[in-house]
Design a protein with these regions (language model features):
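Conserved short submotifs of the Hanks-type protein kinase catalytic core
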Residues: 75-89, 93
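Regulatory alphaC helix of protein kinase catalytic domains
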Residues: 48, 52-53
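AlphaC helix of the protein kinase catalytic domain
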Residues: 91-103
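Protein kinase glycine-rich loop
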Residues: 7-13, 18
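Catalytic-loop of the protein kinase fold
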Residues: 124-143
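Activation segment signature within eukaryotic-like protein kinase domains
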Residues: 112-113
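A short, aromatic-enriched beta-strand patch in the conserved N-lobe beta-sheet
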Residues: 68-70
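Glycine-rich ATP phosphate-binding loop
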Residues: 17-37
């Protein structure tokens, strides 16, 4: 954890927190997904381990890049360090468009759709099709 400086919390969900961080060695901006596993069932812990292992193996331009993971056994917390997508997520994009009474252009919609399909094809063909996302929603589609 001494390799990173926390900048701010940028997300919160049932899984835990997402924090914007800066890697000390090169100043690169990344994020970490912070998950406390102390109250997880054995099955949930296994899913967490599987998620980390899958992220480590996936390498595709439309899948958020995995960099590292830190396990803090004392705090029962796992930190998954990943690429930062500065454009936010599609859920936020939709909310902002609704608020300003604007539309997302068809061209942008098709571009995002094609990238999501490309990422899903990669996931579904990885290790004989054993990788399923299980939570595809606008808030989980990030924009760089």
């Amino acid at each position: 954890m001494d390799k990173y400086d926390v900048i701010s919390t940028i997300g919160k969900g049932s899984f835990g927190l997402v924090k914007l961080i800066k890697r000390r060695s090169d100043g690169r901006t990344l994020v970490w997904k912070e998950m406390n596993y102390s109250r997880m069932s054995a099955r949930e812990k296994q899913q967490l381990v599987s998620e980390v292992n899958i992220l480590r193996e996936l390498n595709h331009p439309n899948i958020v890049r995995y960099y590292d993971r830190i396990v803090d056994r004392k705090e029962a917390t796992v930190y998954i360090i990943m690429e930062y997508c500065s454009g936010g997520d599609v859920g936020r994009m939709i909310k902002e468009c609704k608020k300003s009474k604007e539309y997302i252009t068809e061209e942008v919609i098709w571009k995002i759709f094609a990238q999501v399909v490309s990422a899903l094809v990669e996931c579904h063909s990885h290790k004989g099709g054993k990788v399923l996302h299980r939570d595809i929603k606008p808030a989980n589609i990030f924009i760089d």
